[in-house]
Swiss-Prot record:
It is found in: Cytoplasm. The lineage of its organism: Bacteria, Pseudomonadati, Thermodesulfobacteriota, Desulfuromonadia, Geobacterales. The keyword Nucleotide-binding applies. Disulfide bonds: none annotated. Pathway: Purine metabolism; IMP biosynthesis via de novo pathway; 5-amino-1-(5-phospho-D-ribosyl)imidazole from N(2)-formyl-N(1)-(5-phospho-D-ribosyl)glycinamide: step 2/2. This is Phosphoribosylformylglycinamidine cyclo-ligase. GO terms for molecular function: ATP binding; phosphoribosylamine-glycine ligase activity; phosphoribosylformylglycinamidine cyclo-ligase activity. Its main location: cytoplasm. Transmembrane segments: none annotated.
Length: 348
């Protein structure tokens, strides 16, 4: 009798583990469903029947993103149930700033060797993020690639599609001098600046993943794995009743790089640094890394996850509405005339 033939599992790809994984995630995926979803998990493509009668001139808005090296923290702590929320947040927050309602989401999960339990924890987080954002998880790809990743490592990418009526697109073009800038509080680092944060926390300060942070009642893992806040439902609620001229998602590049993305030519943002209290984790990073303020504001969100430009006359009512939506909001500055040769964001 000849030698036993080589199998796919011998090469490092376990089809049975993949099937187990799919069975484990089905209830999570189904919990995100919307009436427009007309397909089930396991098909070749996700089907979504858009009700165009709800819109005068619907425009689809797409976004894609990842979680970056925050995944390294999840692997160090062996906690994988929150990074999926981050994945959804990074995508849906990017499209809601244009006024779009997220409709559906897809994910890409790549790993060297599939652990059904670890993968299911990640997808559970993705499903939770979709529920928070009101969008359906209608598909995804799980890629098991032996030899491509170190043991226990994985990477994530997310993709979302939303819709907005053409005449309700928010692109910052209607921002004018005198508009007030309102900042929405972040939940922490969100999903940006982690390469620098890891260097300071672990290399410079010498903390371990389970150590308690100084002056904190939280561990390093608890703080660094706090999920990115999803602002979708609050922003969409606000847009139904108030005029918002521009919205910036404060991601990589911080306030200094993201606020200018929505400012029309001839406008600049004046932001008052003392208008909100910077969370302690940012103080720890700044002091631990001996960081200049400019570097802080172009690397981290520093406690502000989203910035809205609104007419000055609406500010009080907007703040009341945001408070009712459980958002911590601060008047952080205003839009001013930008003189030639000056920076588009002035921190004072």
């Amino acid at each position: 009798m000849g030698a036993k033939g080589i199998t796919y599992k011998d090469a490092g790809v376990d089809i049975d583990a993949g099937n187990t994984f799919v069975k484990m995630i089905k209830p999570f995926v189904r919990a995100t469903s919307r009436p427009e979803v007309i397909s089930d998990i396991g098909g070749f493509g996700g089907l979504f029947s858009l009700n165009t009668n709800k819109y005068k001139n619907p425009v689809l808005v797409s976004g894609t993103d990842g979680v970056g090296t925050k995944l390294k923290i999840a692997m160090m702590a062996d906690r994988h149930d929150t990074v999926g929320i981050d994945l959804v947040a990074m995508c849906v927050n990017d499209i809601v700033v244009q006024g779009a309602e997220p409709l559906f989401f897809l994910d890409y999960f790549a790993t060297g060797s599939l652990s059904p339990e670890r993968g299911a924890a990640v997808v559970k987080g993705i499903s939770e993020g979709c529920i928070q954002a009101g969008c359906a998880l209608i598909g995804g790809e799980t890629a098991e690639m032996p030899g491509f990743y170190q043991d226990g490592e994985y990477d994530l990418a997310g993709f979302t599609v939303g819709v907005v009526d053409r005449d309700k697109i928010i692109d910052g073009s209607s921002i004018t001098v005198g508009n007030t800038l309102i900042g929405l509080a972040s939940s922490g680092l969100h999903s940006n600046g982690y390469s620098l944060a890891r260097k300071i926390i672990f290399d410079t300060l010498g903390f371990g993943i389970n150590d308690m942070l100084p002056g904190h009642d939280r561990s390093v893992a608890d703080e660094l794995l706090t999920p990115t806040r999803i602002y979708v439902k609050s922003v969409l609620n606000l847009l139904r009743d108030f005029r918002v001229n521009g919205i910036a998602h404060i991601t990589g590049g911080g306030l200094l790089e993201n606020v200018p993305r929505i400012l029309p030519k001839g406008c600049k943002a004046i932001i008052r640094r003392d208008s909100w209290t910077m969370p302690e984790i940012f103080r720890i990073l700044q002091n631990g890394g001996n960081m200049e303020w400019t570097e802080m504001y172009r690397t981290f969100n520093c406690g502000i996850g989203m910035v809205l430009a609104v007419p000055e006359n609406d500010v009080d009512e907007v703040l009341i509405r945001l408070s009712g939506l459980q958002e911590k909001a601060f008047v952080i500055g205003e839009v001013a005339k930008c003189e030639a040769g000056t920076e588009s964001v002035e921190m004072i």
